[in-house]
Swiss-Prot record:
Organism: Alkaliphilus oremlandii (strain OhILAs)
SUPFAM superfamilies: GroES-like
GO biological process, one term: chaperone cofactor-dependent protein refolding
Name of the molecule in the record: Co-chaperonin GroES
Function: Together with the chaperonin GroEL, plays an essential role in assisting protein folding. The GroEL-GroES system forms a nano-cage that allows encapsulation of the non-native substrate proteins and provides a physical environment optimized to promote and accelerate protein folding. GroES binds to the apical surface of the GroEL ring, thereby capping the opening of the GroEL channel.
Primary subcellular site in the record, as a coarse category: cytoplasm
Amino acid sequence: MNIKPLGDRVVIKRVEAEETTKSGIVLPGSAKEQPQLAEVMAVGPGGVIEGKEVVMEVKVGDKVIFSKYAGTEVKFDGVEYTILKQSDILAVVE
């Protein structure tokens, strides 16, 4: 991947949502909710943002939970990614 985020931004790739419920019902694409779990694909350098030093706390390969309506969705080489600010990441899943 050749997307290089700037500042405190992070590029993530969403983890696919379940297509079948626990009771066995198959969900059509339109009924599936966008997952809030993703893998970090690229991390910006951080630095001074609006007068405050920002240290990047996530790294490539981390699994993260992020705010539901955060970021900008982009398609690159046929793959969908989301670019968001580190502050929109709520937790790292270990």
